[in-house]
């Protein structure tokens, strides 16, 4: 089973940059998107064989997630937890027979960490949500989680210390999540791989120089690890400032 997660930085824009060709090439069972920046009625496109589920922000052209799936989920829910988390279209949960899939676009802490307090609240609440799901069946948690966990996960850790996405507080929340029975699939398989990034600034020719950050993840319940065949990053795929990340699971 192949699952893909990709922050497309505006799906309408990405559709004009080969998104449908990518879907045909990827041959994924599930495609999770973040930062769709649209409502489903804003773009017509043909993607045969996939059911589509959308969660759009109240604010037009902002945030948003989508899940395209070949297998009909047992259930699909949108957002989670308290009311404050229910306006930006950031989470879709699809239940499958063997696991829950949670597609997430984590709030950015913003310049000067101006949204860090909300981000901390979000992190505590999403961890609680994932742990509650995990009590029922294993979880696959994927998306743009807006944090580079360790220094190996970005090109320039020293100059980015305390910038949004690499603050001590954000990194500690990821550590706390992983200590709660979850595993970062890519780092589990490739603990020492350097230069493996999923996002590059549009400035300073960052992608050409591979001056990037690994902020897109597939995180799974630890008991799912025996089924993980591979976890990878596809930096050669363009169309966004992020590239897709991939998880391959053995069938149960």
Set out the residue ranges of the language-model regions.
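Surface polyanion/phosphate-binding segment centered on an Asp-His-Pro turn
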Residues: 232-252
